[in-house]
A protein has these predicted regions:
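Active-site neighborhoods of metal-dependent hydrolases
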Residues: 1-57
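Acidic, glycine-enriched loop/beta-strand segments at the rims
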Residues: 4-9, 15, 59-63, 74-115
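C-terminal cap of metal-dependent C-N hydrolases
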Residues: 16-23, 28-29, 98-142
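Generic long, charged, amphipathic alpha-helical segments
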Residues: 30, 38-40, 51-68, 82-87, ...
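Short beta-strand segments in beta-sandwich/barrel cores
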Residues: 73-74, 130
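Short, solvent-exposed cationic patches
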Residues: 146-153
Length: 153
């Protein structure tokens, strides 16, 4: 048995206020272990795009993308210089791209099954390698660890 404890400490109104705040960046530390995890593991970004951008119009698409890409990269790059290659689309930057349909993107993962992929995200490139192709995870071992230089922690 692999028990988990999940505590719901915020109301939906508090979550919405945090999501739309200009000071808030959106990131996730979720992971899957032994087939179990939290729904945010595969659903955080799709939930923001589907619920808060499309359905509730609480946030513009461009603001949401900035909060999920550029803001976290900028926050970390002072200590982790390689983050200056993240969260941006430009020559020389890491090619980490998610291609999604704003009309259909939505989270589908649940507390019972956090591995259910989000809908409306047909392609994902990590380091220029196709990691999701036509909505299916590929066998590519794309990406690389991001580490702070020694002595900066």
């Amino acid at each position: 048995m692999n028990p988990a404890v999940i505590i719901h400490s915020r109301t939906e109104e508090q979550t919405r206020a945090a999501v739309v705040s200009p000071l808030t960046m959106i990131a996730s530390d979720g992971f899957i272990e032994n087939g179990r995890g939290h729904p945010r593991t595969s659903g955080s970004y799709a939930k923001v795009l589907g619920k808060y951008v499309r359905e509730e119009k609480a946030l513009s698409l461009m603001d949401a993308i900035r909060k999920m890409t550029l803001m976290p990269a900028q926050r970390l790059e002072a200590r982790v210089p390689s983050m200056a290659q993240k969260g941006r689309i430009k020559v020389g930057a890491d090619a980490d791209l998610a291609i999604f349909d704003p009309a259909t993107v939505i989270d589908r993962s649940t507390y019972e099954d956090a591995t259910i992929p989000s809908a409306g995200i047909p392609f994902v490139l990590v380091g220029g390698q196709v990691a999701v192709d036509s909505g299916k995870v590929t066998a590519a071992r794309a990406g690389k660890p991001i580490r702070a230089p020694l002595g900066t922690r």
